[in-house]
């Protein structure tokens, strides 16, 4: 019995002497005392040498000592596991009062934002979006739009030609022709897209974006056009702008006008061009100009974006400078 008490105390002392409450070291002691070759296991095996009369009492005493040591070990194990968990939780604790981590998300390009803004406004008025090819034929880009052969827009210094009949479109007006060929009035469409002109400076780039509108119906008139553009410009810029229509010339509209808005500096700023669809254009697509009339509008997306966000250099839209683009998120 004395031997058993000493063994229990020895086991407890070994457990207490473990440094840093190591669970690995604790498991080594468990194996040493309670494993297949452990001290208590060996004592149980030695019972075979004890007489049958003494064996039950001796076995009970060994089990009692073993249970006392094992309970002490398990208690320490539970205590140390909880301490380890508490330490881990303390290190991983989150201060919910701290601001969240900033998530770097992408954003729409300012040109895309303008396209969405324009198309949303006109779609609510019944205009649908139509698209067309960017590599266009001479007919759809010039001839069908009443642009004569000698017009300077056809020159190499203005237009990117592949051959005498194919070019990169200089305007999305070809979409209007294609739409009028396949649809009968009333027609109410908008044509956003990329266009190309051989020019590059602070206010021009070889590729830019344009949105054109076409409305064809019986009794379409310039008064409707003016009212539509007044409403659009005030909605787009979110200001009660002063708007001016100046007489101008475009081969595909007659009469034609350029539209200006009054800037904050007291100067007029050109924003778009418009006019009544020329009768020759209607005839080219098989629409009787004596029965139907229409108006068309052309606007440069980058131009509108520059005015809305006070951008001074058109080239900034194409340089992918995050310092610039982040201002529009």
Curated annotation (Swiss-Prot):
It is found in: Cytoplasm. Disulfide bonds: none annotated. Its EC number is 6.1.1.20. CDD domains: PheRS_alpha_core (cd00496). The keyword Oxidoreductase does not apply. It comes from the Bacteria. It holds the Pfam family tRNA-synt_2d. Binds 2 magnesium ions per tetramer. Mg(2+) binds at residue 254. Its cofactor is Mg(2+). Its main location: cytoplasm. GO terms for molecular function: ATP binding; magnesium ion binding; phenylalanine-tRNA ligase activity; tRNA binding. One of its GO terms (biological process) is phenylalanyl-tRNA aminoacylation. It catalyses: tRNA(Phe) + L-phenylalanine + ATP = L-phenylalanyl-tRNA(Phe) + AMP + diphosphate + H(+). It is an enzyme of class 6 (ligase). GO terms for cellular component: cytoplasm. Keywords: Aminoacyl-tRNA synthetase, ATP-binding, Cytoplasm, Ligase, Magnesium, Metal-binding, Nucleotide-binding, Protein biosynthesis. NCBIfam families: pheS. Tetramer of two alpha and two beta subunits. Belongs to the class-II aminoacyl-tRNA synthetase family. Phe-tRNA synthetase alpha subunit type 1 subfamily. This is Phenylalanine--tRNA ligase alpha subunit. It comes from Haemophilus influenzae (strain ATCC 51907 / DSM 11121 / KW20 / Rd).
